[in-house]
């Protein structure tokens, strides 16, 4: 969506300062909540990554973990990857974890897009997916796991030691755990790309809070737990939600079915599929073209947004041709184990589980994989123990720079609409605005990534975080339809909008060329 200089300027000039006190954005205490079971995905999407026997791209600087061969590299995070990291770190393996992110989908994996997890043991009142992942990540880090929020681009498990190459480093290792999860499927409607992030989304929790969806009629496609959960979540913001189900019944759990069917703000359309998107003369999404699967009858349903909840595809492309996969792309493991067809390579989580796909089963498989790695290393006389002190997290002092009286433009990082108005009108620097929402897991992933890049250009950039629920008028004027979203301004001109989570080098290159 094109955002005019006039609209943003008007919003920044007219919006009254918020009277409520807001906590300051403190980048150093933000813990990344990375890529879940969907890590390493840019590479993963790239079956385009070079094959092992092809010429590999130039190697990045070697890992600073040491010049030797590491015990274990874990590719991916989520409940499988983080659990594996916890067990491996406690066993003194000092695992190297590439958390990565999911290109074209939702960083942090499926739990990062889940509102309430009500069936994970130990949380009688439930827990949000991002909060659960945050706790797991901190636990892995506390016991000595080496975490890198980087995208894996190349894997060679055909020769030893194995080689894992990310966007920033190369690591050699004796064993690998693949916990890359699965990516959200798309319908591939004729106009899907045109309206992706402009009305179509695969993440209700990321994009549902957008001011452009509030009070509107929305639709969700799918009949399982993911789709029903998205429909329920969207009723917090939408006037009404339509759930489109291809078959004549829901596949979701009985509890989720009851909640959907008894919700007056949700209408379920059985035997119905989406055929395409309909737009108005302004080029905005105005509806969905539907088709009955039983009669073939077609109709148009007026909605302002369409959300997908139609399942996932395993992120195993990096391993194609190197380990055994089934016809759907899931990694094949020996029954009851995490062992793949390659000795020393193990798989955990949704990348090898096409049946259960639960957070607790993913965590269990991560545990099995880590214990299997330890046995493998011992049996082959490869284990080198690293005894590290347990890392205790220190409380960070939180200061509020962004209330009107305390604002200081000499600082680089700020939060809230008052700060944005000040830097927008007064700063000669490039202005980077990050739009977030409270329940957005990918926002937690992006904050530390972007923060590190901003630190590199401290004298050339001003950074402001905007919570779209606290400052909806700013988000609406900027045309924000989902979070996370980054906009760059200079001299009151908007230069670029970047939706979702990207690699550090993409933000770095843009800032470098526009500072």
Curated annotation (Swiss-Prot):
InterPro entries: FAD/NAD-bd_sf (IPR036188), FAD/NAD-binding_dom (IPR023753), Ferredoxin-NADP_redctase_2 (IPR050097), Pyr_nucl-diS_OxRdtase_2_AS (IPR008255), Thioredox_Rdtase (IPR005982), Thioredoxin-like_sf (IPR036249), Thioredoxin_domain (IPR013766)
Cellular location(s): Plastid, Chloroplast
GO molecular function terms attached to this record: enzyme activator activity; identical protein binding; oxidoreductase activity, acting on a sulfur group of donors, disulfide as acceptor; thioredoxin-disulfide reductase (NADPH) activity
UniProt keyword list: Chloroplast, Disulfide bond, Electron transport, FAD, Flavoprotein, NADP, Oxidoreductase, Plastid, Redox-active center, Transit peptide, Transport
Positions bearing the site annotation: Important for activity: 227, 245-246
Location of the active site: 440 (nucleophile), 443 (nucleophile)
Consequence of substituting residue 206 to S: Loss of thioredoxin reductase activity
GO terms under biological process: cell redox homeostasis; hydrogen peroxide catabolic process; regulation of chlorophyll biosynthetic process; regulation of starch biosynthetic process; removal of superoxide radicals
Reaction equation(s) it catalyzes: [thioredoxin]-dithiol + NADP(+) = [thioredoxin]-disulfide + NADPH + H(+)
GO CC terms: chloroplast
Protein residues bound to FAD: 77-80, 98-99, 106-110, 119, 152, 206, 350, 357-359
Distribution of this protein across tissues and organs: Expressed in roots and shoots.
Transit peptide range per the UniProt entry: 1-45
E.C. numbers: 1.8.1.9
Disulfide bridge positions per record: 203-206, 440-443
Pfam families, A to Z: Pyr_redox_2, Thioredoxin
Cofactor note: Binds 1 FAD per subunit.
Family: Belongs to the class-II pyridine nucleotide-disulfide oxidoreductase family.
Cited function: Thioredoxin reductase (TR) that exhibits both TR and thioredoxin (Trx) activities. Contains a C-terminal functional Trx domain. Functions as an electron donor for the plastidial 2-Cys peroxiredoxin BAS1 and participates in a NADPH-dependent hydrogen peroxide scavenging system in chloroplasts in the dark.
Known partners and oligomeric status: Homodimerizes under reducing conditions. Interacts (via thioredoxin domain) with the plastidial 2-Cys peroxiredoxin BAS1.
Protein name: Thioredoxin reductase NTRC
Biological source species: Oryza sativa subsp. japonica (Rice)
Highest classification ranks of the organism: Eukaryota, Viridiplantae, Streptophyta, Embryophyta, Tracheophyta
């Amino acid at each position: 969506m094109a955002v005019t200089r006039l609209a943003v300027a008007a919003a920044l000039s007219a919006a009254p300062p918020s009277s409520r006190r807001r906590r300051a954005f403190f980048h150093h205490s933000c813990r990344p909540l990375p890529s879940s079971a969907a890590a390493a995905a840019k590479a993963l999407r790239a079956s385009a990554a070079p094959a092992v026997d092809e010429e590999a791209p130039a190697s990045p600087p070697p890992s600073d973990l040491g010049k030797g061969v590491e015990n274990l590299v874990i590719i991916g995070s989520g409940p499988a990857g983080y659990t594996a990291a916890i067990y491996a770190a406690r066993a003194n393996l000092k695992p190297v974890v590439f958390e990565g992110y999911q290109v074209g989908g939702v960083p942090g994996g499926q739990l990062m897009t889940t509102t309430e997890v009500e069936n994970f043991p130990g949380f009688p009142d439930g827990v949000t997916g991002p909060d659960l992942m945050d706790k797991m990540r901190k636990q892995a880090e506390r016991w000595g796991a080496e975490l890198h929020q980087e995208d894996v681009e190349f894997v060679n498990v055909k020769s030893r030691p194995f080689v894992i190459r990310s966007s920033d480093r190369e690591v050699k290792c004796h064993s690998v755990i693949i916990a890359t999860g699965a990516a959200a499927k798309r319908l591939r409607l004729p106009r899907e790309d045109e309206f992706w992030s402009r009305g179509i989304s695969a993440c209700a929790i990321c994009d549902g809070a957008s001011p452009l969806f509030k009070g509107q009629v929305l639709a969700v496609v799918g009949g399982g737990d993911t789709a029903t959960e998205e429909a329920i979540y969207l009723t917090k913001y939408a006037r009404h939600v339509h759930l489109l189900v291809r078959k004549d019944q829901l596949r979701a759990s009985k509890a989720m079915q009851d909640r959907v069917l008894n919700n007056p703000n949700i209408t379920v359309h059985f035997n119905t599929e989406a055929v395409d998107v309909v737009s108005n003369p302004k080029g905005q999404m105005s509806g969905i073209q539907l088709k009955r699967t039983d009669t073939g009858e077609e109709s148009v349903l007026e909605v302002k947004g369409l959300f997908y909840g139609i399942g996932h595809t395993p992120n195993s492309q990096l391993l194609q041709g190197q380990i055994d996969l089934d016809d759907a792309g899931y990694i094949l493991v020996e029954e009851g184990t995490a062992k793949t067809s390659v000795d020393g390579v193990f798989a955990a989580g949704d990348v090898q589980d096409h049946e259960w796909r639960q957070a607790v089963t993913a965590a269990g498989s991560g545990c099995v994989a880590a214990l299997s790695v330890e046995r493998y290393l011992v049996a082959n006389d490869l284990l080198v123990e690293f005894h590290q002190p347990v890392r205790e997290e220190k409380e960070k002092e939180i200061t509020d720079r962004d209330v009107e009286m305390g604002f200081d433009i000499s600082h680089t990082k700020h939060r809230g609409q008052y700060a944005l108005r000040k830097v927008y009108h007064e700063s000669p620097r490039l202005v980077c605005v990050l739009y977030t929402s409270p329940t957005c897991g990918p926002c937690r992933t992006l904050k530390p990534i972007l923060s590190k890049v901003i630190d590199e250009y401290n004298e050339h950039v001003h950074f402001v975080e905007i919570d779209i629920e606290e400052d909806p008028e700013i988000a609406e004027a900027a045309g924000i339809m989902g979070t996370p979203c980054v906009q760059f301004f200079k001299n009151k001109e908007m230069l670029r909008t970047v939706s979702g989570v990207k690699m550090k080098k993409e933000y770095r290159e843009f800032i470098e060329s526009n500072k």
